[in-house]
């Protein structure tokens, strides 16, 4: 998506350790008109899929997923990284390692909100090594739902998570794929 690539070049900041900061428009402060364009693009890409649920993981994916869901006119459900007192009933659970936070999370999702009747589109802001997506895919499989595919805003192609998932037959649609990053530049695929 050319608009996204231009925005990354204009406002993104490359940090040591293969970190790309896009917090001014994507995952801390959210530029709603811009994210609307992302939502329209995912709707265009998945127009042929019978999506009934958008799935993401807290926290950065939630805002994007909500905008995308408006174009499909379906609910968003998000996996939580922590148990809370207001969660009850049966849960799907998995462990997910975060590249950015260097932590392993126990991720949970209520069985009330995802089942065999669902056709799921997973939405997330970043794809690096694929751990978060693999965990969400495991939850979808455990629910008996159909995974229609994944929608990623920015994929770090040099970390090969997307390549690995595609090799497994998962439909991965990324709006911008970065093939290389140095401390002062990046290259798109």
Task: Label every PLM stretch briefly.
Residues 1-51:
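Active-site-facing substrate-recognition patch
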Residues 2, 6, 18, 137-189:
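PRPP-dependent phosphoribosyltransferase catalytic core
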Residues 51-58:
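Short glycine-rich phosphate-binding loop at a beta-alpha junction
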Residues 52, 118, 148:
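Conserved acidic residues
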Residues 63-72:
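Short Gly/Thr/Asp-enriched flexible loops that form oxyanion-binding sites at enzyme active sites
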Residues 74-120, 186-188:
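Short, glycine/charge-rich flexible loops or terminal/linker lids adjacent to PRPP-binding catalytic cores
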Residues 124-142:
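Active-site/ligand-binding-proximal alpha/beta "capping" segment
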